[in-house]
From Swiss-Prot:
Alphabetized HAMAP family for the sequence: RNase_P_2 (MF_00755)
Presence of keyword Hydrolase: yes
Identification of the protein by name: Ribonuclease P/MRP protein subunit POP5
Residue ranges the record marks as coiled coil: none
Keyword entries, A-Z: Hydrolase, Nucleus, tRNA processing
EC top class, as a word: hydrolase
Catalysis performed (reactions): Endonucleolytic cleavage of RNA, removing 5'-extranucleotides from tRNA precursor
GO process annotations (BP): endonucleolytic cleavage in ITS1 to separate SSU-rRNA from 5.8S rRNA and LSU-rRNA from tricistronic rRNA transcript (SSU-rRNA, 5.8S rRNA, LSU-rRNA); tRNA 5'-leader removal; tRNA processing
Molecular function GO terms recorded: ribonuclease P activity; ribonuclease P RNA binding
Subcellular location: Nucleus
Pfam family, any one: RNase_P_Rpp14
Species for this entry: Schizosaccharomyces pombe (strain 972 / ATCC 24843) (Fission yeast)
Amino acid sequence: MVRFKSRYLLFEVLYPEAKEFFDYPTIPSDSSITTSSLSKIIRTMVAENFGDVGIGKVASSLTVKYFSPNTSTGILRVSRQHFRLAWAALVLIRELYGKPVIIRVVRVSGTIKKAELAAIERNKSEIHNISLMDEPIEV
């Protein structure tokens, strides 16, 4: 028996319309965005863009394992054979709950541990960048 092999996609949600927060790298997402609602939205995008064949390929394996509204990052699990289909569906999402968004896949990993470590490293670097922005500039 062959074990189920999957890929984990670390993605971030960007808000292009938020000009008041333009200096900061990430903007928190709405707290109403949950893992289950994201899964439904991604499945809908697969069905709209790739039809019954596309949804048949990814339906059993597509799950959002993690989503943080504070950092607007998430981890999506999908079968290794069809991860590019899920990636394309993520990129095609243009709106979440009425707000225009851009979803960018940051990393593709074979294990959830490596995807989590990549998310932690991204968060650490963003905290460092924000702390550098908040320091006063001496002239």
